[in-house]
Design a protein with these regions (language model features):
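Eukaryotic helix-grip
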Residues: 1-144
C-alpha cells in the first residue's frame, strides 16, 4: 500500500493530490499532499494541506507500514474562498503483518474540521469504519 495510490481506494476524499515528493532518506519517504472533502449542501467544503512521512519498514521489520501526518501551509495551495481549511493536528496509521493474510491496523486521527460537534460526532462513528472497509476491499482486489 502506497499513499500516492490512495485515490484508488480511499473514498473519504473527493480529491487527493501529491503536491511535492521528496527523495527517500533513511528509509523515510516524505510527501506534501492536498486533500479535498465535499460536504453536504448548506455546508462549506473542507480541504487540508498536510505533510506525511511514510516508513515502509519500521525498526528493521519489513512487515510494517507506518504513516504520520500533520497540517502545514504550502504556497501552491493557499486557503480558498468558500472552502474551510481543516487542520490535521496529527494522524497516524501503523500496519503490521501478524502472519500471511492477517494484518493489524492501528489508527490515530485528531482532525479539526471546524464544524459543530454534533456533525463531527455523527461522521466520527462512520468514517473509520468506511476507511477500513475501503482499504480491505482494495487489498483483497490487489491480492488476486
Amino acid at each position: 500500500m502506497d499513499t500516492p495510490g490512495m485515490d484508488k481506494w480511499d473514498e473519504t476524499f473527493n480529491k487527493h493530490e501529491i503536491i511535492q515528493e521528496f527523495p527517500e532518506e533513511n528509509g523515510i519517504k516524505k510527501i506534501i499532499e492536498y486533500l479535498f472533502i465535499k460536504f453536504p449542501l448548506m455546508m462549506d467544503n473542507r480541504d487540508i494541506v498536510q505533510e506525511k512521512k511514510i516508513w515502509k519498514e519500521y525498526n528493521g521489520n519489513k512487515n510494517c507500514f507506518l504513516t504520520i501526518s500533520k497540517s502545514i501551509e504550502h504556497p501552491s495551495h493557499p486557503p480558498q474562498k468558500k472552502v474551510v481549511r481543516a487542520e490535521m493536528v496529527i494522524s497516524g496509521m501503523f500496519l503490521y503483518e501478524n502472519s500471511p493474510g492477517e494484518t493489524s491496523i492501528y489508527m490515530v486521527n485528531n482532525v479539526d474540521l471546524k464544524i459543530k460537534s454534533d456533525f463531527v460526532n455523527k461522521i466520527a462513528k462512520k468514517s473509520p469504519k468506511d476507511f477500513l472497509e475501503n482499504l480491505t476491499k482494495y487489498c483483497k482486489k490487489m491480492s488476486k
